[in-house]
Amino acid sequence: MNIKDHLSKVTEYFSPKVIGEVNDVYVKVAKIKGEDIPWHNHKDEDEAFFILEGELLFEEEGKDSFTMTKGDFYVVKQGINHRVSAEKECHIMLIENKSTAHTGEVESHVTRSIEEQLK
Amino acid sequence: MNIKDHLSKVTEYFSPKVIGEVNDVYVKVAKIKGEDIPWHNHKDEDEAFFILEGELLFEEEGKDSFTMTKGDFYVVKQGINHRVSAEKECHIMLIENKSTAHTGEVESHVTRSIEEQLK
């Protein structure tokens, strides 16, 4: 299936949807707009970001913030506090362990259960 | 780093290069042109394909062959014999377990060790 068809089913910002299962990881797509994702980390889990469309502001502790654009690929390593936001709508692909909570241990109004992400 | 920069370093067809490590998986890019990849399977490992540019002919046992185009995402499940080829140069992203041999247990002239893929 094309990534655009998967994205067309995403109706909420910050709400990742699983598009594939590859061994112990889920591949997901999400749409980001705004600053609603809280600072968080994934204690034992790396998380990969790939920009499909638009621009994503990436903030990571101990680093200068940087802007990711279409085609950029970045892995935030386990345990590192980070936050992503976007002024305009941005489409991303995520590669995460199945066990990864997308906002880490931080519960916020954008937090979605894995069941919701699998719908 | 942008996927185009990673791809610009790929000088051989069928020779995947690791662009990121996410927990137990490697994310790779590769360029495909021709029919040199042998039929193979990955006994215990799923393998994800994402088309970055061009068209990829996907053949999988028990299915009609199909053509993947830019933005298409597909996971071939563990143990299923498959083969990919491309008439014109095609750029792909792969998501594979670190332990996955890219041509399965089949050794061919395109087979590359993980050390070569990490260079």
Question: Where do the language-model regions lie?
Answer:
Chain A
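Conserved short histidine dyad/triad with adjacent acidic residue
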Residues: 26-42
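Glycine- and acidic-residue-biased ligand/ion/polar-headgroup-sensing regions
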Residues: 25, 44-57, 61-62
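Short acidic-glycine-tyrosine-enriched beta hairpin
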Residues: 62-79
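A cytosolic small-molecule/anion-sensing beta-strand core signal
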Residues: 23, 52-53, 69-70, 88
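Short glycine/proline-enriched turns and hinge-like loops at secondary-structure junctions
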Residues: 41-44, 86-88
